[in-house]
Amino acid sequence: MKKRVTLSAVALVAVLASAVQAQPVARDGLLADAAGRTVYTFDKDTAGKSNCTGGCLAAWPAFVAKPGAKPQGDFGLIEATGGQQQWTLKGKPLYYFAGDTQAGERNGDGSGGVWHVVPAPAKY
């Protein structure tokens, strides 16, 4: 039992560490992380505040910034669940979609009529 718990804890740390990212980048006209994973916005969020909690975060994980990341231009940071920093664009929190398993996928676009891919800003 102890071995199983230890392995589960190690796996969880690996997953959380892989979700921590540098500032978004432009890829194929959309915002993505450095690995090419598409990021999304949620219409029910308000500027500077995420309204995606609980089960929502399981399907739409926050796009979490690396420790020490600094806001730049239209990109900002808000406190995410767990005390980490979540990237924002013009105050709108950014997320991944758990259903996107490969770089460049956009399977969450339009989901529920409230989730959207993010076009890369023109100056990007």
Regions found by a protein language model. Name each.
Residues 1-9:
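Bacterial N-terminal signal peptides that target proteins for export
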Residues 8-17:
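Bacterial N-terminal signal peptides
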